[in-house]
């Protein structure tokens, strides 16, 4: 689908791994898919690095109760997204409701909750205006959205 977004999650690199963000961006650009890319990570440093490599890189911050920076994010997710220059927040679905989505959208922040596998949660995300979802069951998502 030429309109699909490609969400590439980058994990925190193991010691000795270098330039994973730079290599990812270069690979996506080489395949002429950069305009469809969003890089997501639980590690905000990798998202900042992506913006330093190319300020046009779209980034999404993944977070859950286990996130090392959860206190900062939980208190004010929009302020945290702006602090790290993230284009999107990718929260655990339990954090998302209609007010959360409205507040993010008013601030220009995209929201793609995860892991949205239940049909009812997919319907709610759609009704509330979620920009997208991260799911393990894309076939179910397609049938629910149609």
Locate predicted features.
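Short loop-to-alpha-helix "cap/lid" segments that border enzyme active sites
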Residues: 1-146
